[in-house]
Amino acid sequence: MARHEFQTEVNQLLNLLIHSLYSNKDIFLREIVSNASDALDKLKYLTVSDDNYKNISFTPKIDISFDDKDNVLVVQDSGIGMNDEDLQNNLGTIARSGTKAFLEKLSSDAAKDSSLIGQFGVGFYSAFMAAKHIDVITKKAGSDGKIWHWSSDGTNSYDLEEIGADSDLTKKYGFDDSALTGSAIVMKLNDESKEYASRWKIEELIKRYSDHIAFPIYLHYDQNKYDDKGNVTSTEKKVDQVNSASALWKRPKSELKKEDYNEFYKTIGHDGEEPLHYVHTHAEGTQEYTTLFFVPQRAPYDMYQADYQSGVKLYVKRVFITDDDRELLPAYLRFVRGVIDSEDLPLNVSREILQQNRILETIKSASVKKLLGEFKKMGEAADSAKKAENPTDEDKAKIEKWNKFVANFNRPMKEGLYSDYANRDEIAEIVRFKSTDSSGTGDNNWTSFADYVQRMKTDQKAIYYISGNDEKNLRENPLLKAYIDKGFEVLIMADDIDDIVIPGFGKYKDFELKAVNRAGSDEELGVDKKEAEKKDKEFKPVVEKIKKALGDAVKDVVLSKRLSAESPSCIVVDENDPGFQMERMMKAMGQEGMGVKPILEVNGDHSLVNRIKQTDDEALIKDVSEVLLNQALLIAGVEIKEPAEFVKHLNNLLA
């Protein structure tokens, strides 16, 4: 028997599971049964799609047995099974790039963290919450027939060995039958978990969490017979099927309760929480298919990772095809969990065929429109509830539901504005933004484009926004005051993708979107042109002095027509240049920046600017110019290149 060390991250996870996360220990059985179902799905698919597997003997089922004297619980499936390489990859390591971040996210808050465990796809390890030792006996279908024994107590290492057809373990779990494949998970329960070696506890958990599993789950138990005095006279071996074994999504919606959907979601979503929303659709006609989609309460841990795991499973006539195809829904809907089941796709469809299949493309298109329609209705229901004079509990629930959606999924929905041209009008009704409007239409002044337009001034020609990396900084930007004073509402866009998405989106209905921190966005402020020309002429020497002092640090210096008296300067970006957010994103991705240079606007009514007007002292002009630029950069949330130099110039002015 060879001993192997667990990957460091597995050790950390097991330590958390065993010592910290006890809030909902019951989920371990749900996770083990779900894994067994996945193993059956995979083999079932191979038996209909791969000639090498079509003639194997395959009876899909899950068997659960227990020993209440030795406190042992066994879950065995007749699925795909594993070889030694699979065991090392699946049960010895966590091959995910986000492992470290996930473990950092886990905390001592057990109620919260239990849902994260399954999200990360480490359901097997959750068994160590109840078991002090686990043995896995397994044989892989279509392989060399070798039987493997994996064993661990969850501390630091595991043992792995090949066992013969004549070994006791092989015979005990039936793997001496050459036709039998699959895995047996043998859990020696710890002292605090003896209740799981009980017929009634197992049956209760299967009915609660796994009734919808599409394969039969059989519970093996001993039933005693008693005489009149209560003495055991005989014991009979019994086997009962304890789940309904029907694909929940294929059942009529009228037969299903909210609880049925919730428990199904917890299994396929590996989540301890109920879904935020679900939508169940049966489509008939040219194509026949069923979709059942769920929106989680919280964003999946890997939503912003390049190797995020797709949350949608594809079935054909209830035969599992794949759960690893990101083409089933567009990337901006990667937080959606659920099932697509087609009656028309071929069973032996390959990954390459899927990517070009018209049937699947039609299903995808209809599914996206259905989901977007549901999201829009959620938002409208919440907005309507917010306007109620005396909101009911139902109104409050609608508002809370929508606020959760916005808090978790507003950013990926914005990605859709940029990437999904066909549906951008629908997405534009869903996305929300912070705003300078004091009434707002949601908590913390979230608003929609539609509500912004309703509040616009009568002759207003554009939707105004300001973008940057920090909401607080943006709200304090001196540019805002000019627009607010003139009665213009400004959207606050502090997401790192806003500088990419919004210019690409461009217009909402007939209204152009204009960034107030870009040049050329001040035409509606009602500036007196004659007065502006007079002032430009008066301050032209001042502007030239500042340009000379700053050199290549700026693209241009102009006299501002919108700053209030207390603000000496601000920076804007040229209409045709990428924003500072784009620059920041590129550098964060290890790419060379585009060298965006700001345009410095200076306020001729401010005393600091007038100090330059009154002097030809080049040192003083340099000090004032550097302070005007760098304080404007700081207020805009842009990193200054030489902080020490800035402080030196500031001190010179204060001396």
Per-segment meaning from a language model:
Residues 1-191, 195-196, 457:
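GHKL (Bergerat-fold) ATPase N-terminal catalytic module, capturing the glycine-rich phosphate-binding loop
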Residues 116, 134-177, 190-195, 200-655:
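GHKL/Bergerat-fold ATPase module in large chromosome/replication-associated machines
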